[in-house]
């Protein structure tokens, strides 16, 4: 029964190929005819309908009937709001504050974003050691005015928002309980090897839009890290080792020119890698660099590649637009081409290269039979 199905599949393929043998581009016409939605060829991620980095801050647990009586609102600083229906939340955002006010001990969620705060003085949170979230993004905080131990007593802190400030170095020490750390849109130039030491519970680290030139081995101890964003920096090298739990790595818009052989094997759960707008060449990539069975999406667009690097057959989305690729090698996708061995690739972007449609091998439709979008 199995051989009958295989022979039937092969026969259908031969029949389809013979039917369109007068049109060398029949496969492209077929793929376009199957697209049911509008496609923008300049959109690097045409199927991505969500914001890559959703930015929302919860408002904390609400007071419900039957709970203990709400606390006395008189302990709330006059510069802020402490609504009775959110008894553990203090809202001090968008008030032109230049300093951090007193924080009552009952607070777990404090919001100081979008003010003119320049410093985080030592001891400012010592009265509220049960804090879970601190939002300080969108201020004018500088590194020399952040108390060195200002966060050390917050043993329950889970989320810290310090993005969109004027920080030039990593804050610390930070509590081990931290799960999300937002330091993007600052002026940080390096990440010392011990800057993130002990943060074994950290799942998301946002360092995009800084001036980072080196991260060294600072990421190795982050055994729970799932998302790492280092995009829009000045990195010339990838980090020395990746956390084993990592699923999303964003390093677009840097100066990376090489990726070591088998680099991603240390992150067996990695799903998404974005290395667009770097300085990658084929000489800087080994043959097994991207042959990771877990990868679903790989973005190498706008680099200096001349050949398609070999990828694993499990890859679903490959973005190579804006390079210097001048040949189409089917072996980059399928080491063996037949009716039972094929790539799972669905989206392939090759537009903006030096390759022509006529370079497409005759056996490409058999290898890339699951593709729904191919742009050349």
Swiss-Prot record:
Affects the rate of fibrils formation. May have a primary role in collagen fibrillogenesis. Residues 67-105 form the LRRNT domain. Glycans are attached at residues 127, 166, 201, 291, 341. This is Fibromodulin. It comes from Homo sapiens (Human). InterPro entries: Leu-rich_rpt, Leu-rich_rpt_typical-subtyp, LRR_dom_sf, LRRNT, SLRP. Binds to type I and type II collagen. Keywords: Disulfide bond, Extracellular matrix, Glycoprotein, Leucine-rich repeat, Proteoglycan, Pyrrolidone carboxylic acid, Repeat, Secreted, Signal, Sulfation. GO terms for cellular component: collagen-containing extracellular matrix; extracellular matrix; extracellular region; extracellular space; Golgi lumen; lysosomal lumen. SUPFAM superfamilies: L domain-like (SSF52058). Residues 1-18 form the signal peptide. Disulfide bonds join 334-367. SMART domains: LRR_BAC, LRR_TYP, LRRNT. The keyword Repeat applies. The modification Sulfotyrosine is found at residues 20, 38-39, 45, 47, 53, 55. It is found in: Secreted, Extracellular space, Extracellular matrix. Coiled coil: none annotated. The modification Pyrrolidone carboxylic acid is found at residue 19.
